[in-house]
């Protein structure tokens, strides 16, 4: 089995199917009648798409009829160890009748973007490059997730190709070591910088992952056509999740003539075919597109066009990257079919230190960690039970290991005054970043 793509069971737990819950649900539905979904209210209104009524909303609440599905039943006992009763006799469920809903806790972070300044801070006294400090404050949160995904913006081609920043990035293999140490399970490599070091860099990166960490899911770059055609499947709790990764382009660098499959591009015909295959193989489909316009805090019409393509073909979750700033989160659903899709248009940068000095630079140091809980509805079908976003900030100081990303909620105003970003954009502060998060995400973020 090719661990870069298909069906690697990273983590698996034992589950049962819920006979009692299903029977109870059927009884309740029969009693309550049919819900008129056309009367559902949303915060952003509704839009007509291809003759179907599509509603969208921005909210941190779980959605679906079974948004809160976890029920724990246990016998109450008195001091003698016997089951106690109330005035109203109730039959207690047996051990076989007591179940908990299976869940997959997923997180994803945005671009890991290593400019020259950041590489200088990662260089140690012995000349080696170490990146563990970048992720240390968020490591526990990353490792706590069942499925942790990162968008690796720059190529990891190794020191032999030279360690370079903008415009043609390349990082040493120790960056990959740090990503694995931090707890990431899946690495998205389809970005506009995937071909920065041409075919040699691409193959070097692929070989690193295959030989050093074959258990890590690496998406978006391919050594063979067979790899391009495979669908990565993550399975846990009996739920199969397909993850697809694409980029809008490669900065004008052509794919190798003998490797037209090298990078997953946003080609509609191929994307739709991939989604169809994913829908057949998995229960839940995620698309991670590298799309949009850099430094714009709102999605573009092109992003919305692609979101509709994903939605129309059955995708359940979209988590976008590339703009280097955060963008809105939107939930779309079809009131006729009941299909729902959650879209994070952009998570911004998870790690970066660009050298520009101008208005808007401060926005690039605010990022988001998407948090999504995938569970089962009463019919045993996968659903999004809950979702949200954690605001993050990259702190930068000119010293070894002086760059790291932490929760915005744990960042202090005093610490922000020591950030080098103030010299690039003097509006940078904790208060300013909180204002941007409020503007883009509303009450969704934490």
Indicate residue ranges for each PLM-predicted region.
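Ser/Thr/Pro/Gly-rich low-complexity, intrinsically disordered segments
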Residues: 1, 39, 55-58, 75
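Acidic, metal/ion-coordinating pockets
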Residues: 32-36, 45, 51, 63-64, ...
